[in-house]
């Protein structure tokens, strides 16, 4: 895998608050190598380490995108939901930004059945088929469609398991992370000072509570994916 320059700037990361960790009482001792200091009761992440792992992650997604691989971005906390959707849409990735439905990956056949149902209902709605049904039936199917749109809208074009999963918050998204580990799907995970750096394939030490921090990390990854995709399209 070729190493590239991704314009990862320490000053820019400081401005985004990437270096702010959790309180010193809420930490995982495994994160000690990634912590540079304590300040006013919170741990400070070593941004040199963050830059290194973010660069490795960018290299990985660029290489994968240049070979036509598929990505899934997961982040279901309310405040990060819009950033996750925006990043995924920009990079033409699949995403989950609401509740993670248990077994979404490990029980893929069930997810696939739900996706077929979702697509059928969307087609029925677009062609006016739902309006030709009795009111009670139409209302029930519209509620079903709304539910599927909420939870599966970001993966509606997914036809198989993703090749790489990007996880925004290890604590919040522990279930999808475990599903990826079970299936052997490579993961890139943003980890704060209370996380386990050994679980993901590439762990990026960063502030997972700050929107500006999350956006900066996602922006770098999205740029790398887009660059890789453009090369894949040119060579196709």
Swiss-Prot record:
GO BP annotation list: translation
PROSITE patterns in the cross-refs: RIBOSOMAL_S2_1, RIBOSOMAL_S2_2
GO cellular-component term (any): chloroplast
Primary localization class, coarse: plastid
Molecular-function GO term, any one: structural constituent of ribosome
Localization terms from the record: Plastid, Chloroplast
Origin superkingdom: Eukaryota
Gene3D superfamilies per the UniProt record, alphabetical: Glucose-6-phosphate isomerase like protein, domain 1, Helix hairpin bin
Keywords associated with the record: Chloroplast, Plastid, Ribonucleoprotein, Ribosomal protein
InterPro entries referenced in this protein's UniProt entry, alphabetically: Ribosomal_uS2, Ribosomal_uS2_bac/mit/plastid, Ribosomal_uS2_CS, Ribosomal_uS2_flav_dom_sf
Pfam family, one: Ribosomal_S2
Family per similarity comment: Belongs to the universal ribosomal protein uS2 family.
NCBIfam families: rpsB_bact
Cross-referenced PANTHER family: 30S RIBOSOMAL PROTEIN S2 PROKARYOTIC AND ORGANELLAR, SMALL RIBOSOMAL SUBUNIT PROTEIN US2M
Name of the protein in its database record: Small ribosomal subunit protein uS2c
Organism: Guizotia abyssinica (Niger)
